[in-house]
Amino acid sequence: ILTGITTTGTPHIGNYLGAIKPALELSGPETESYFFLADYHALIKQTDPALIQSSVKDIALAWLASGLDTEHSNFYRQSDIPEVHELTWVLTCSAAKGLLNRAHAYKAVVAENISNDADEDKAINMGLFSYPVLMAADILIFNATHVPVGPDQAQHLEMARDIAGKFNHTYKSTFVLPEALIQNEVSVPGLDGRKMSKSYKNIIPFLCTEKVLQKAISRIITNSLE
């Protein structure tokens, strides 16, 4: 199995319950497991190198504190594997633009721009547009057979399969077509009742002092689920 977390901020309880805990439950001595810190994916939204580096350390600590066994798992930072980025370019040349046009994250930004009467390409960089190719490289380079994903991420896995299939057909059978392990969606309420998210600034940090934790909990809107 293979999974990663984008290093764009402070890890929180939602990350643990929705990504870290389920992934660790799937791993074990008999499973070849890959867990990575997706610091190049972070560049799509975060332009401050210091914040990305800080997030790398915090998320690494979160994985280790949650019980990741480095003796039986491969644990790495994405940017430390240059072959991932070499493969990204090779796969980019096999990825159809029409396929990337259908990516949910890209389409959502385009739709928002249109609804705001803005240029549909506003605030869209090539990192966002070609994000599925980098994700495909993350998966295919290790010939991962199974990838745990939430329902909203299943499309990324399908796109990786499409890109791998196109490459295999054009050249030779090289890549395993990975299977999705669809995880039950875990929607953890944040401090304001909305889904816990760094974007909403409503998180309960996973790694913090008791004082900080008490302060965060005291902000919870107690009737937010009513």
Predicted region positions:
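N-terminal Rossmann-like or analogous alpha/beta NTP/dinucleotide-binding catalytic cores
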Residues: I1-A137
